[in-house]
């Protein structure tokens, strides 16, 4: 909602500037577009609980968003003070009562030193209310000026965040941070990074259709990526004033849960869009995020990729295929266990699917398969497919 402009991170339009500890939001008029309200967050919690999703990420919960971007201010956020319409205790209690957790969000506005000053208090607050993961953000030019997102100062900063979070038993999903280089092997609480153009760029003109079949060969070689997939209503103009569109088909979005490896995955569309395409959403309900094995079945950089992954601690497999140009994927099920049968659900592009002309055309095929079977699957231009293979 915020990315396309139907909601805002900010609470009010009354403030041209914000001063930490001085600005009194209780005297401000709400703007009516603030996204992180008690009512809206509870709606998302209910949806997550109903569909087996573990956490709800809430952005724009804390004071300071009226003055966060473009001014290169050091002291905008303290990361502990919620807006008047966000009851942090009530919402966490409500989420826990539903078997769901809230995920914390710390947008730093690239004021790294300010974040470090407040980090202990911010993580203590998370421990107090039961948060176990934080999405950090570094939008805008780095403060102090003259530093860059990839500079030594910032690499040292990202490392301090990871290590401090680990002491608090907190997982980190860093956005706009430096490209990881395997550090998650040493610090496994780094469960995700953006560090490349993710789905949010689809609202700003879009990523080319080959983008998602290039990243597995480049960005993802250094560690997991939070690509924020799962957009079903790909024509943004159909539900907002944004004229951009997502450069994949609906099934192409499903494939990203396998192609874009991350032990932390987002379902980035609106609940009402998932309810509209509930049969396709079943794959997101089913797909795992942690794996015992991965096999790359076919791949060509910037052209196509097909990967199969075995869900951790189970005999279940999931397969995702993504393409730039239209093609027929050939999936050989040689990786399945001999002697077992699998309930196979194939989510594939429809015959007339195309990421620009007909992105929501899809079909779901159910069958029983075994080791050695071969599946031939249609992939549309900018499309893809997803398969669940559940051991019987």
List PLM regions with ranges:
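Aromatic- and carboxylate-enriched substrate-binding clefts and catalytic-loop regions
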Residues: 59-245, 249
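Catalytic cores of secreted or luminal carbohydrate-active enzymes
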Residues: 251-298
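Generic beta-strand/beta-sheet core signal
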Residues: 21, 58-59, 103-107, 134-139, ...
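Conserved structural scaffold segments of CAZyme catalytic domains across common CAZy folds
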Residues: 1-98, 106, 384
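C-terminal beta-strand-rich structural cap/linker in extracellular carbohydrate-active enzymes
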Residues: 365-392
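Carbohydrate-binding surface patches
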Residues: 300-343, 385-386
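Conserved, mostly hydrophobic/aromatic
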Residues: 48, 172, 259, 319
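Solvent-exposed beta-strand/loop surfaces of large extracellular or lumenal domains
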Residues: 346-372
């Amino acid at each position: 909602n915020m990315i396309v402009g139907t909601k805002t991170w900010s609470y009010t339009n009354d403030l041209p500037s914000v001063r930490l500890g001085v600005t009194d939001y209780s005297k401000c008029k709400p703007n009516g577009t603030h996204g992180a309200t008690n009512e809206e967050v509870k709606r998302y919690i209910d949806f997550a609980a109903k569909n087996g999703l573990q956490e709800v990420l809430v952005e724009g919960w804390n004071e300071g968003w009226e003055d966060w971007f473009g001014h290169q201010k050091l002291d905008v956020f303290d990361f502990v003070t919620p807006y008047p319409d966000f009851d942090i205790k009530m919402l966490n209690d409500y989420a826990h009562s539903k078997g769901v957790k809230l995920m914390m969000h710390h947008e730093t506005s690239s004021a790294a030193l300010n974040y470090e000053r407040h980090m202990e208090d911010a993580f203590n607050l998370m421990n107090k209310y039961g948060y176990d993961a934080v999405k950090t953000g570094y939008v805008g030019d780095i403060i102090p000026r003259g530093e860059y997102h990839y500079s030594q100062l910032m690499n040292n900063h990202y490392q301090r965040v990871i290590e401090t979070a680990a002491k608090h038993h907190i997982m980190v999903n860093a956005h706009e941070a430096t490209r990881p280089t395997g550090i998650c092997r040493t610090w496994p609480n780094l469960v995700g990074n953006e560090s490349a153009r993710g789905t949010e760029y689809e609202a700003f003109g879009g990523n080319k259709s080959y983008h998602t079949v290039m990243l597995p060969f480049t960005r993802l070689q250094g560690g997991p990526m939070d690509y924020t997939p799962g957009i079903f209503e790909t024509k943004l103009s159909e539900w907002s004033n944004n004229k951009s569109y997502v450069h994949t088909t609906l099934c192409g979005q499903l494939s990203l849960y396998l192609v874009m490896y991350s032990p932390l995955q987002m379902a980035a569309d609106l609940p009402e869009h998932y309810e509209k395409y509930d049969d396709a959403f079943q794959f997101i309900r089913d797909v795992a995020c942690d794996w015992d094995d991965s096999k790359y079945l076919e791949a060509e950089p910037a052209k196509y990729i097909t990967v199969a992954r075995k869900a951790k601690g189970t005999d279940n497999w999931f397969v995702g295929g993504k393409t730039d140009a239209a093609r027929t994927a050939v999936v050989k099920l040689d990786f399945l266990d001999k002697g077992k049968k699998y309930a196979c659900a194939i989510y594939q592009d429809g015959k007339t699917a195309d990421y620009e002309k007909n992105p929501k055309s899809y079909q779901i095929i159910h069958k029983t398969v075994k080791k050695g079977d071969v599946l031939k699957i249609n992939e549309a231009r900018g499309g893809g497919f997803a398969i669940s293979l559940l051991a019987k």
